Amino acid sequence: MSWVMVSPELVVAAAADLAGIGSAISSANAAAAVNTTGLLTAGADEVSTAIAALFGAQGQAYQAASAQAAAFYAQFVQALSAGGGAYAAAEAAAVSPLLAPINAQFVAATGRPLIGNGANGAPGTGANGGPGGWLIGNGGAGGSGAPGAGAGGNGGAGGLFGSGGAGGASTDVAGGAGGAGGAGGNASMLFGAAGVGGVGGFSNGGATGGAGGAGGAGGLFGAGGEGGSGGSGNLTGGAGGAGGNAGTLATGDGGAGGTGGASRSGGFGGAGGAGGDAGMFFGSGGSGGAGGISRSVGDGAAGGAGGAPGLIGNGGNGGNGGASTGGGDGGPGGAGGIGVLIGNGGNGGXGGTGATLGKAGIGGTGGVLLGLDGFTPPASTSPLHTLQQDVINMVNDPFQTLTGRPLIGNGANGTPGTGADGGAGGWLFGNGGNGGQGTIGGVNGGAGGAGGAGGILFGTGGTGGSGGPGATGLGGIGGAGGAALLFGSGGAGGSGGAGAVGGNGGAGGNAGALLGAAGAGGAGGAGAVGGNGGAGGNGGLFANGGAGGPGGFGSPAGAGGIGGAGGNGGLFGAGGAGGNGGLFGAGGTGGAGSHSTAAGVSGGAGGAGGDAGLLSLGASGGAGGSGGSSLTAAGVVGGIGGAGGLLFGSGGAGGSGGFSNSGNGGAGGAGGDAGLLVGSGGAGGAGASATGAATGGDGGAGGKSGAFGLGGDGGAGGATGLSGAFHIGGKGGVGGSAVLIGNGGNGGNGGNSGNAGKSGGAPGPSGAGGAGGLLLGENGLNGLM
């Protein structure tokens, strides 16, 4: 028996080539028609007239024959193109039925599919994100904590190829301790970025802020995730989360530790998280997080210790100590990581400013074969080590004199309290120095210094200095994190200073051009109006974009700050929270909106999911972020899902609407549209339920599919309150329509009315199902009431 193999892509390409040839021939025939069908006679005699008529008749006959041939040729090209499309449609239609039973067996046996992304944890529940498929898939993001109660959920683990999900953020507690942020999901077993730890919740009445979640562990070739920032507290700030360790065997930098939370009235700042350790062979340790500041009589907190490098790589810089602005002492700096074989020791972190300047951290010693000690190292007890340091310093002297930076070695930290920039790392390898904390202002605080750039070969960018606090005016802007060049992670942006208006966080540094994690944006400063978070740094060739910094805490009568935008992914990397993917990468999940305790002030809207890369071969757009919750105002809309790639890729799911304790629930965000050719539309986000006499939020509309794919399902409407007289459940979202081949998405169910025995209103109207494809496909089912 003979077999015939057909490649639809080649058939469609051949049809396009043939169509181009036919078009060129038709154009040539049309250009020649004027001169060949109506010849002028050479003279007035009968012979000339007869010859002209003969050749004109020949030209007309040729044009008639050409028209018939062109019609046949067009029919042939059309049939060939339709055949290629039919083969492609058959393959696309076969993918989902073939994959579904395979995934079902894996889900039944292991709880996770073979191919596919894990589900995000529902907002307001603290649920963990689902793990990605064993083969291909990103882990889902952890759900945010329940309002006024719980910790954020952990991010799901990535598959063999995929990234771990981000840990969920916690919410505040009135009079109690803030919940801990969820841990970031572990990266894939091979490639992929680890998830970022969730931000700890702030306390709102006299207790401790929640600790930031730990960063996830990197895969075999991946960097560890960054620890989440600790939440601010009235007494004590929450500790920053520890940075995740890189992949065990080969390459990857350790994740940076999270920044400690600030203390607002009478206590201590939270300690900075320790930097993660690098991979076994190649990679630098993660930088320690900066200690949290104290705005009253308490002391600033200690900076986190830098992580250990691989055999080749620099030790991580210790985090700067936190400042005290109310008469307490500055916090001590964290210790730098120790070099192993080739690489510099990390700088000790600078002490925080205060009534007494905090003690600088101990610098790490350089590698045994080659490497310079970090700044403020311990006294050497080895003559051989002392000789090695002297030789390297002699080599560095001319480079330092001519260019302002050494050949091998770290840049110096900026002086605390001056806002001085950190020095650049050595031309060959070295970490950038941390930026100095901004000046303490009588009115406005000074900006923090920028972190220094890492070395050309390998080295981590320095962490930006935190902005100085302003007594009655603006808090200082946090310094930008330093950028890495080839191999290395970007430095984290500095936190904004506290003030009447909190300072904005600094932007994270860009990752190395080849490998390394992008730096996270700094957190906004606290104030009557919180400062905005800094933007995450952009990823390198294989690196994901950095997460945007969280918005600053606002007073009970003011608004919290807006979260920073996620950085764009590298060529193959995914975007940070809300950032666009690289050329081939997936879009990042939109950031969750901030929680609001102010009377009549709604929480922040969920961020839009990032679009997948233009040339993505199937990567999805990022899911929209969930809307922020509110105690006294209406919930806000969830973010829209990101679009798939230009041709291939599914749209991201819309974010869930924000929960409201007394107002109407927020509407779910719309699902993102798929790529033009192949991909399914994203599902609409669910509308938030409401409590009391209020109306549930409407579900978001499903996204439109590509030419071959399924329309996205509409989101379910939110339920109305327990005693919601005259209020109805939220309306279900409309299902997305298919285009050529594929089923329309189902409409969302309407929200439930009040519980039995209560004076509840009517259930919400259901959403209409989307239209099926023009060539093949069923209409989606209408939602249920």
From Swiss-Prot:
The keyword Repeat applies. Residues 1-93 form the PE domain. Keywords: Repeat. This is Uncharacterized PE-PGRS family protein PE_PGRS10. The gene is PE_PGRS10. Belongs to the mycobacterial PE family. PGRS subfamily. It comes from the Bacteria.
